[in-house]
A protein has these predicted regions:
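Bacterial N-terminal signal peptides
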Residues: 4-16
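Acidic, serine/threonine-rich low-complexity disordered tracts
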Residues: 20-106, 113-114, 118-250
Length: 250
């Protein structure tokens, strides 16, 4: 187990860097809606990186009398995977902001559809167990930052947005491994007339591990949105999550 912990901490650290996904989870749109975003990342003394992600929603049905949907984000890496693939969270469709700020805890199930190793799913107890093993703790917040609406212009289109302050503090402190602290601070501009609500977001990510500090600035910008026919077939969940499979067959 001692040899496992550095690998587990590395993978769980990647999850904390994706804490910004919680800004999309509040009051999800109806199944079939989608949106695309460009993410620009800038690190000191390195060229800027550009990536594109797509969010979508598909129906799951009811759980304990409440409507649940799958929030899909793709393509992204998960738990240290070499491959990028769709990552899906099974969430209440009417999830409030408090629930969205606790995205991992709010998910009834998480599915990572690895195209090479195959899909696998995590249940809440799997998330809790893995968090305990690596000493993972995180807090997210999204709060109003300006009582007045702001105009955000993207190309030929202008959006009337509410500005919110985003903060995330994460600690990963497993035995035998140096503690890592990850701090995300930024601003989100939201317009609730579009799917997922987010028009633009800008934030800084700082990772502190011992005397090593890494920083990156990111800008996420809406590039498109719409509605399509949601898939009718059941989602392929694959095998249940296993630490051994994660470490030796990922």
């Amino acid at each position: 187990m001692r040899l496992m912990l550095p690998l587990l901490a590395l993978g769980w650290g990647a999850i904390s860097a994706s804490a910004q996904w919680s800004i999309f989870a509040e009051k999800l749109p109806t199944p079939g809606h989608w949106a695309t975003y460009q993410i620009e990342g800038v690190k000191p003394n390195e060229p800027a990186s550009l990536t594109t992600i797509r969010l979508s929603v598909r129906n799951e049905g009811t759980i304990t009398g409440k409507p649940y949907v799958w929030l899909s984000i793709e393509p992204i890496a998960w738990l240290g995977s070499k491959e990028k693939a769709p990552l899906r969270f099974l969430l209440p469709q009417n999830l409030d902001r408090a629930g969205a700020n606790k995205l991992l805890e709010s998910a009834a199930e998480i599915v990572f559809s690895n195209p090479v190793k195959g899909a696998y799913h995590m249940l809440p107890e799997d998330v809790t167990s893995l968090s305990d093993k690596v000493g993972f703790k995180t807090t997210n917040s999204l709060e109003a930052d300006n009582p007045n609406a702001e105009l955000i212009k993207l190309g030929e289109k202008s959006w009337t947005c509410n500005r919110l302050k985003m903060e995330c503090f994460t600690v990963i402190d497993p035995p035998f491994v140096k503690k890592q602290t990850i701090i995300i601070r930024g601003t989100v501009w939201k317009d609730d007339t579009i799917p997922f609500g987010v028009v633009q977001a800008k934030w800084s990510e700082k990772s502190i591990k011992g005397d090593k500090v890494n920083e990156e600035q990111k800008v996420l910008t809406l590039t498109g949105f719409g509605k399509e026919t949601a898939p009718a077939q059941a989602l392929e969940r694959g095998d249940r999550f296993s630490i051994w499979k994660l470490l030796f067959n990922r």
